[in-house]
Amino acid sequence: MQLNTVIFDMDGLLIDSEPLWNEAAAEVFKMYGVSLSDEQYHSTTGLRTKEFVQWWFRQFNLGDAEHARAEKLIFEKVMMKLETKGKVMPGVQYIFRFFYERNFKIGIASSSPIGMIDLAIEMCGIKNAVQAKASAENLPYGKPHPQVYLDCATSLDADPLACLCFEDSFLPD
């Protein structure tokens, strides 16, 4: 089967957002009296914001009442940081042009919310090339579960076996 579709992750691959997620999480957790070390933060890199917040709230016995508020605040702070100091990763426009000129179907599959995916597409200047986007935000399982990639492939009317996927994060063992 010939490859005819390419699906990209977003955070850390298209935009340098990981440090911004770290900053936003640090600011929000500080409100709850928690300071995460770099090692602690990196041990949960790749989790969806909801899972990240739930994990650390459990670890620090912060209770369940504030989960949704903390998650919302982190997302709002990341969006503001992306707008003011977000950076597009080197080579993004080149690689999108490469696949676009070869008539590949192109999609983005991310754990981030759709609003952030839309902002990243705008920042990268790739709106005309992206034909589908999928978020794992409301899926039963986040990455590394492949559902978000399968959903994106379905949106592109692509056979998953004909897809080339670019992903930079793997959860630790």
Listing of model-derived features with the role each one plays in the protein:
Residues 25, 92-121:
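Substrate-recognition element of Asp-dependent hydrolases with the DxDx(T/V) motif
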Residues 22, 26, 49-54, 71, ...:
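An amphipathic alpha-helix signature
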Residues 1-43:
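Active-site neighborhood of HAD-like aspartate-dependent phosphohydrolases
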Residues 85-87, 113-173:
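Substrate-recognition "cap/lid" segment bordering the active-site pocket of phosphatases
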Residues 57-94, 102-104:
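Metal-dependent phosphoesterase signature
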Residues 28-29, 48-63, 120, 153:
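Helix-loop "lid/cap" segments that line or gate small-molecule binding pockets
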Residues 34-36, 62, 126, 158:
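Helix N-cap/coil-helix junction residues
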Residues 1, 101-104, 156-162:
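Glycine-rich phosphate-binding loop signature in dinucleotide/nucleotide-binding domains
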